[in-house]
Amino acid sequence: MARDKIALIGSGQIGGTLAHLVGLKELGDVVLFDIAEGVPQGKALDIAESSPVDGFDSKLTGANSYEAIEGARVVIVTAGVPRKPGMSRDDLLSINLKVMEQVGAGIKKYAPDAFVICITNPLDAMVWALQKASGLPAKKVVGMAGVLDSARFRYFLADEFNVSVEDVTAFVLGGHGDTMVPLVKYSTVAGIPLPDLVKMGWTSQARLDEIVDRTRNGGAEIVNLLKTGSAFYAPASSAIAMAESYLKDKKRVVPVAAHLNGEYGVKDMYVGVPVVIGDKGVERIVEIELAGKDKEAFDRSVAAVQGLVEACKKIAPDLLGR
């Protein structure tokens, strides 16, 4: 049986890490695409040469033409300019919007049946633009944000409580940025909600608030430490978890930037919410009832995403006609 083809648009740090993870997990064959000649070919060859050591048989190739992604079952998009110190995700808008238009056209022509995962920032606006540019069904185009943000939240909580990350569950909703909403009420350690752990004396509310703030600034913290780039290991792992749920029809419940059409009171926008991912793409949107501060924070986050989308519409009004 032929292996699935997984196309990676963008061969930077995340793209290379994605390619290696696909091989290690034997998820399929890999096509690394990039406009920079030699870069995808070099990374593909380097990773392929690790396969005898790591023991995987995935085939890896590099390409500078979109024809190479033809028939891909999954496309993961990392193309675009990364954030630099002092640069907000929003600063990237006009540059990366043009990239999404080009990538969307390539996917539309060569991989119209693919499940597409967007990682490019500013995420919620870029995945909206990518879906418009590609013309793919909205349930087949998602943004990777919530899995990463929730993983950061889980890691910080596990570190605080000195427990295994496997026993910590956490949900982060809303836009992928400063307005994201880590939901303390729905986050647990071995099924015990965080508010109960505060009552049990495991931590204080003030300390929990600090962890929530650190989660919101998780990406910026790494950007400031690296000084020459942004996170790539955790983002790649997060996207692979989403791809694996689709390829293996695992029906995992994960927070992603999904297209909302009335859910959560949001219309024709991509916002981070929990969904079920199976072999049809987004098979169900899990609509959590939000109230009080959580609802206010989510609404603020949606408004921030709306502002980015409106800016996209002004920069590229032709996207609306697609």
UniProtKB/Swiss-Prot annotation:
Gene3D superfamilies in alphabetical order: Lactate dehydrogenase/glycoside hydrolase, family 4, C-terminal (3.90.110.10), NAD(P)-binding Rossmann-like Domain (3.40.50.720)
Does the UniProt entry include the keyword NAD? Answer: yes
Whether Ribosomal protein counts among this entry's keywords is no
Q: What is its EC number?
A: 1.1.1.37
Catalytic site: 176
Reaction(s) catalysed by this chain's protein: (S)-malate + NAD(+) = oxaloacetate + NADH + H(+)
Q: Where does NAD(+) bind?
A: 10-15, 34, 96, 119-121
Key words of the record: NAD, Oxidoreductase, Tricarboxylic acid cycle
Domain of life per record:
Bacteria
Task: List, in alphabetical order, the GO biological process terms annotated in this UniProt record.
Answer: lactate metabolic process; tricarboxylic acid cycle
Residues annotated for substrate binding in this entry? 83, 89, 121, 152
- A Pfam family: Ldh_1_N
Q: Coiled coil where?
A: none
- CDD domains, sorted: LDH-like_MDH (cd01339)
Report the family membership. Answer: Belongs to the LDH/MDH superfamily. MDH type 3 family.
Q: What does this protein do?
A: Catalyzes the reversible oxidation of malate to oxaloacetate.
Q: What is this protein called?
A: Malate dehydrogenase
